[in-house]
Every structure is written in structure tokens, then in C-alpha cells.
């Protein structure tokens, strides 16, 4: 593990990822139920870049209430990528499991100090599977190695066991040390979409000091594969259920699901039986994610959604002129962050959705930060946001940290 100081202050590949409490009792109002209201004042955000591990592409994917940010950074030369943790002014390189690459790709969230993600081992893929790893890693070594979920705590990285198969993936973790993700079992499923060979199932790992217990989660009746993507401190888990296709995409995401008390529930879709992928869940059980478009099984156009127990599933919409959106993070105030893109994926922008209104986060920046915020990945209960920005002059992509700083009058 290497520490670095920092200053205080993908069209198809995107589709794999991903690769989100009402205030004072107020009722959540959706955009389609009332027109957007323009405030005479609005919150501004002071944005700062986070340091990198030497490469020109980094991203914050998770931020907890202690302002610990985890994600990834390319190494010098941009041929390799490592999971990264930005904590209290220090950038930590979390290393790998013996292979060239690793990443924290989802919003981990817990306050306990556990970081989870995916890492390559030194072992070659025995069945020639891709495990979608080219979606998570750069360069010529992005495939060909066995991938496992990992958990990091206090400088120690541990591999998470599988259900007997070769590969695994960890996405989220709560304060009890319950880690969610998915792993392969031993069944060679003839219905798997090549190059996938083995079925994979959603799991919860109970991480103890001396042992890790793996618990498989049930699928929707008739489904064969699935993945768990996020967990809250009440033990509610969200994820996907479908067939042995791309995790976490396409027909593996036939159903967006919620697990609680040992049961699985289909939370619905926006009209398509594919790409229905929850990405985050808050303590109230509100869920955000993205869903497929009817007639588009390749996932060229996705739509951000929010699901609540009382309101069901609703689309969040897109920014003006855009057709594509994802929701990646949600806090207890039901503030949602994500990205919105035009049809050509040339203009992608981070957004903040609140009380039924989606705002371009770039319009809420305090003066002095020139880079474009192109993807917001997570938001904590203080309203602090992390994601990725792009410098318009150099093209460098950097992880950012956005902090609410006050109100600007208009």
C-alpha cells in the first residue's frame, strides 16, 4: 500500500457499470407531477481535484459521511489501474491481488472503514472468460486474469471467496461488515452468453476478523444468474436477476430486485426486460439506478430511475438535449446524482436531482473550477459529491470532490 499527499482542495463499456429521507417529513415530488421551479437562490459547490497515482484518468465512485472517497486511478502510462482511497488528505494505493489491475467501481458507503471492489489475480482465466473486466480496466492487460472481489481494512487486503467458480466481484458494504456482490458457481451453463461459461449468483459475504462466510441470495423464479449491487445498514440489498449474460448488464438485468428478510422482490422496470440495474439504496430503502429502453437490448439508451416503497419506480429524466441517463448515488435527503448524455455521448454531464428537478452540476459550481463535471457517482448525507471531471484543454480526467459552500442569489 502506497500513500501519496494531495492538494486539499466508453460508450458500450459504460453500460456494464456501473458502471444511485425526505427533509423534515416533506413528500417526494417527481418531475412529471409538477413543473420545475426556479429558485431565486441556489446552493453552490466548491470543487477540487483529487490527486492521481500518476495516470491521466481517475474517478471517485464512493463517498461516505466521513468524506472518505474511494474509486480508481490509472498508473503512469495509463496501462494499469489501481483501486484508490482518498482519506484525510492522503491518497492510498490499495494495490491488487497479484495481477495488474484493481478498482472500486460502486458506492461502498459504510462508516466502518471497509473498502470493497474487484482485483485481478496472477492466475490466468482457465475457461477463457472475460468477466466484463475490459469495462473496468485499461490497457492490454484488462482481460485474461482471474478476478476476485476484495475487502480492504486498515491496510490489509483480503480476497473474497467464490461459490466454487473462478471469478467474483464486490460492490458494497454496510457498517456490520456485510459485503455484497456476485461470484461464479461450478455449473457450466449451456445458456450462458459467450465468453461467459459459468453461472454467477448474488451473494452476501459476512466479513469477520478470522473468517469470511459466503451466503447466496435467491433469484426470481426461473432465473439462473444475478448480482447484488448495494446494501444498507438495515440489511436490505438490491441487485439484478436474469440469465447468464453480462454482469451487470443486458439480460442478466432482466429484473431489478430488492432482497430483505430472505425474500426477493421484483421492483419493476421502465418497459424493457433488460438493463434494469439498481446502483444504490439509502437507509429508508429508496433505490436508484438505470433501466433499459424497449427495443434496445444492447443498452445504447438507458434511463435513470428512482424506486420508493410508496411510489414505485419512476424515471428521473435527462438534462435538456440529452437522451441517456444513469443514477449512481442517493443520500438520506433523497438527493440523487448521476450522469446525463446526448445521443452521441459527446456531451455528458454530472447532475444533481432533488425534489423532482434535475440540475446540471456544472451550473452549481462556485467560481474558479474550469473543468467539466461529466459524471457524479455518489453523494453523502452532507451533500458532498464525488465523481469525475474532464479538463477541456488537456483532456485529463480527474476524480473530484464537491462540497456545498453556500447560496448564490440570482
Go through the PLM ranges and name each one:
Residues 2-410:
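Residue-level hotspots at or immediately adjacent to binding/recognition sites across diverse folds
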Amino acid at each position: 500500500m502506497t500513500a501519496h499527499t494531495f492538494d486539499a482542495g466508453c460508450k458500450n463499456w459504460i453500460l456494464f457499470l456501473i458502471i444511485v429521507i425526505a427533509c423534515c417529513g416533506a413528500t417526494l415530488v417527481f418531475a412529471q407531477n409538477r413543473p420545475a421551479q426556479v429558485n431565486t437562490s441556489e446552493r453552490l459547490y466548491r470543487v477540487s481535484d483529487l490527486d492521481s497515482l500518476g495516470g491521466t484518468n481517475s474517478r471517485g465512485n464512493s463517498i461516505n459521511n466521513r468524506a472518505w472517497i474511494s474509486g480508481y486511478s490509472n498508473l503512469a502510462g495509463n496501462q494499469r489501474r489501481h483501486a484508490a482511497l482518498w482519506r484525510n488528505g492522503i491518497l492510498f494505493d490499495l494495490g491488487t491481488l497479484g495481477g495488474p489491475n484493481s478498482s472500486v467501481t460502486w458506492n461502498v458507503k459504510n462508516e466502518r472503514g471497509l473498502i470493497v471492489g474487484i482485483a485481478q489475480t496472477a492466475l490466468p482465466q482457465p475457461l477463457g472468460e472475460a468477466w466484463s473486466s475490459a469495462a473496468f480496466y485499461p490497457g492490454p492487460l484488462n482481460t485474461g486474469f482471474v478476478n476476485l472481489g476484495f475487502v480492504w481494512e486498515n491496510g490489509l487486503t483480503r480476497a473474497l471467496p467464490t461459490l466454487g467458480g473462478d471469478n467474483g466481484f464486490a460492490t458494497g458494504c454496510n457498517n456490520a461488515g456485510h459485503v455484497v456482490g456476485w461470484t461464479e458457481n461450478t455449473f457450466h451453463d449451456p445458456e450462458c452468453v459467450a465468453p461467459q461459461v459459468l453461472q454467477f449468483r448474488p451473494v452476501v459475504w459476512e466479513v469477520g476478523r478470522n473468517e469470511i462466510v459466503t451466503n447466496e441470495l435467491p433469484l426470481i423464479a426461473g432465473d439462473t444468474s444475478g448480482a447484488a449491487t448495494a446494501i444498507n445498514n438495515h440489511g436490505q440489498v438490491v441487485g439484478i436477476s436474469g440469465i447468464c449474460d453480462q454482469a451487470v448488464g443486458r439480460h442478466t438485468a432482466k429484473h431489478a430486485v430488492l432482497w430483505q428478510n430472505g425474500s426477493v422482490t421484483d421492483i419493476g422496470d421502465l418497459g424493457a426486460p433488460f438493463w434494469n440495474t439498481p446502483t444504490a439504496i439509502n437507509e429508508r430503502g429508496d433505490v436508484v439506478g438505470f433501466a433499459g429502453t424497449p427495443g434496445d437490448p444492447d443498452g445504447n439508451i438507458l434511463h435513470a430511475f428512482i424506486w420508493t416503497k410508496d411510489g414505485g419506480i419512476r424515471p428521473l429524466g435527462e438534462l435538456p438535449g440529452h437522451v441517456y441517463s444513469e443514477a449512481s448515488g442517493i443520500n438520506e435527503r433523497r438527493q440523487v446524482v448521476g450522469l446525463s448524455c446526448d445521443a452521441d455521448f459527446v456531451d455528458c454531464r454530472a447532475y444533481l436531482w432533488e425534489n423532482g428537478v434535475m440540475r446540471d452540476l456544472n451550473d452549481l459550481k462556485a467560481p474558479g473550477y474550469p473543468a467539466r463535471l461529466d459524471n457524479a457517482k455518489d453523494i453523502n448525507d452532507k451533500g458532498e459529491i464525488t465523481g469525475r471531471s474532464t479538463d477541456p484543454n488537456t483532456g485529463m480526467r480527474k476524480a473530484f470532490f464537491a462540497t456545498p459552500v453556500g447560496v448564490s442569489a440570482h
